[in-house]
């Protein structure tokens, strides 16, 4: 578990790959002004948290509370990234007294269905993992180029992020299992979420992982919810433009109403 910085506590939940290390630029940017508590998902070998396969998706919801308890935090802003958004929203619905704010970054919604390419990957994750990795740079190139237009800075980002990914490899089999766990889970009613909520997405043309319209579905379900587009980003804006992402969250935490 990572506990870094001082100020308003933010619990940052990683996406489907399950590794907090992939989010390090966002962790560092947020920790300049806030206290960031993050972790890898509990079914990762490096995780210090328990995982009972019989509990399936509920493991991750329990993990959020365990992390807060270990950090000595009674209440926090809970932020979920992509698949982590499902975890964050479920925790906010089931433990509303512990959530003072909810942030859903390029988040999956319970109604999400994988597209054809994603379904192929889920059927044979190990066999297709090399193809998935090999085609990742091409899928992300437009987004990274928009976020980091300077060639030198872009090359440095790709090298640094690639190093983080290689050092903290994701398990294709676990990723596929996480999707199945979510699809089988009985989610709490969204009206149980009482915390002010911020939806952060990239631009629709740049997110090739989770369509922006999927994340926006929360706007129809939550009473106190707003949407902000992080310009020149797609699905991974919190790492391509971490300071901008931290700025959006900071203004949300300060209670400033942002334009959707």
Region locations from a protein language model:
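Conserved HGGG/HGGXW glycine-rich cap/lid loop of the alpha/beta-hydrolase fold
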Residues: 2-48
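Active-site loop/oxyanion-hole signature of alpha/beta-hydrolase fold enzymes
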Residues: 37-79, 247
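Short beta-to-alpha linker loops that shape the active-site pocket of alpha/beta-hydrolase fold enzymes
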Residues: 40-45, 108, 233-234
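Gly/Ala-rich beta-loop-alpha elbow adjacent to hydrolase catalytic centers
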Residues: 80, 84, 88
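Flexible "cap/lid" loop of the alpha/beta hydrolase fold
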Residues: 93, 100-131
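Conserved alpha/beta-hydrolase catalytic His-Asp/Glu region
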Residues: 113, 134-191
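Conserved loop-alpha-helix segment in the C-terminal half of the alpha/beta-hydrolase fold
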Residues: 197-233
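Catalytic histidine-centered segment of alpha/beta-hydrolase-like enzymes
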Residues: 230-242, 246
